[in-house]
Design a protein with these regions (language model features):
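Extended, charge-rich alpha-helical scaffolding segments
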Residues: 2-94
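Short terminal interaction segments
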Residues: 2-6, 92-171
Length: 171
């Protein structure tokens, strides 16, 4: 369940465990959905299925907004910790400084969120590499079309180089 950005302001300052678990549950759910979308996007990019990529874009954008909302909630929670004179460097530090009834559950959620964040980084990098490879391929195709597949010699005088059939209709 994703909360409104100002929901943290309405929480009691002593209800740290609920605030942490709610935030982490929302974050984990959003991260899992984003991993699935990025996997589907990777498959679509490799197969050059533009229709699938377009279909995935709105959901990916919504998940990005949800991740941003989780980040904002995290920042609000850490700001509340700061005002309560609790450690505010990160959620793990905060969780170690407040009494938790389900400490193992909170620690497991923190660990899972950290692991999924790493997976999201790797999947995003993979997709970026695929996109760059596709752009390079398109660039090479355009170069071949415009030059007729022939490049100008590095050394040589008065050497005729084909301009390509798009540019001068000679090829």
């Amino acid at each position: 369940m994703i909360h409104e950005p100002n929901a943290m302001q309405r929480l009691a300052h002593d209800d740290w465990e609920t605030a942490l678990t709610d935030l982490l549950d929302d974050l984990l759910q959003t991260q899992q959905e984003m991993l699935q979308i990025l996997e589907q996007k990777r498959i679509a990019m490799v197969s050059r299925n533009l229709a699938s990529i377009r279909e995935l874009q709105p959901r990916e954008e919504e998940l990005c907004r949800q991740l941003t909302a989780c980040q904002n909630r995290r920042n609000e929670l850490l700001a509340m910790a700061r005002t309560a004179n609790l450690p505010d460097g990160n959620l793990e530090q905060l969780s170690r400084s407040v009494p938790l009834q389900q400490e193992a559950g909170v620690r497991e959620r923190l660990s899972n969120a950290s692991h999924r964040a790493m997976l999201l980084k790797h999947q995003s990098l993979t997709n970026w590499i695929i996109a760059q490879r596709n752009l390079l391929h398109i660039s090479q195709l355009l170069e071949n079309i415009t030059t007729g597949g022939q490049t100008a010699p590095t050394y040589g005088k008065n050497t005729r180089v084909a301009g390509g059939f798009i540019l001068d209709q000679e090829a």
